[in-house]
């Protein structure tokens, strides 16, 4: 698969990327599965409800068992009553995680990268470095490359790049092992350094 190789002025040449990573068919069902699993695994329980033992209530029987013509009632904490406990309350300890096999996850990442390459949303650079940790420098460099919303995948995130890009709203910088499916899809472009492509090939190939 041929990708654009950009220089510092944004001029493009051609880079031959490995087909093992960028030449796969798009598997929509698999990509959907790993994205949903990624979101589920990032979710934490934040809902809490009370069951009938936890709500504040009296243990007095509302009325006698027989003779009133009304339905039997033992306590006002019953789930049948307004203000009573829930029969099956939500708990912060709920586990939302979904298991995805490593082989499936890697295949899904390859599928996403291949589709992004076909849509011309992947570009390559030799390296991505900055002289100092200034957001202005990072913004100017990305502007010269013609990039605004971009995920930068580099073999090693140095301190200058991290500090300079963390305040840019539509820019993220990660190492290959942290390139998750949601981020790959979210950003308009993916910029990858040559050493990072070698690492991706080693991880996913």
From Swiss-Prot:
InterPro entries in the record: Ribosomal_uL4 (IPR002136), Ribosomal_uL4-like (IPR013005), Ribosomal_uL4_dom_sf (IPR023574)
Is Ribonucleoprotein included in the keywords of this UniProt record? yes
Q: Which GO terms describe its cellular component?
A: ribonucleoprotein complex; ribosome
User: Which protein family is it in?
Assistant: Belongs to the universal ribosomal protein uL4 family.
Q: Which NCBIfam families match?
A: rplD_bact (TIGR03953)
Q: Which PANTHER family match?
A: 50S RIBOSOMAL PROTEIN L4, LARGE RIBOSOMAL SUBUNIT PROTEIN UL4M
Q: Which residues cross the membrane?
A: none
Q: Which GO terms describe its biological process?
A: translation
Does the keyword Transmembrane belong to this entry? Answer: no
User: Disordered: where is this region?
Assistant: 43-95
Instruction: Name the residue ranges with Basic and acidic residues bias.
Output: 48-57
List the Pfam families.
Answer: Ribosomal_L4
Recorded source organism is Bordetella parapertussis (strain 12822 / ATCC BAA-587 / NCTC 13253)
What is the protein named? Large ribosomal subunit protein uL4
GO MF terms, alphabetically ordered: rRNA binding; structural constituent of ribosome
Instruction: State where composition is biased (Basic residues).
Output: 58-69
**Organism domain of life:** Bacteria
Q: How does it assemble?
A: Part of the 50S ribosomal subunit.
Q: Tell me the function of this protein.
A: One of the primary rRNA binding proteins, this protein initially binds near the 5'-end of the 23S rRNA. It is important during the early stages of 50S assembly. It makes multiple contacts with different domains of the 23S rRNA in the assembled 50S subunit and ribosome. Forms part of the polypeptide exit tunnel.
- Keywords tagged on the record: Ribonucleoprotein, Ribosomal protein, RNA-binding, rRNA-binding
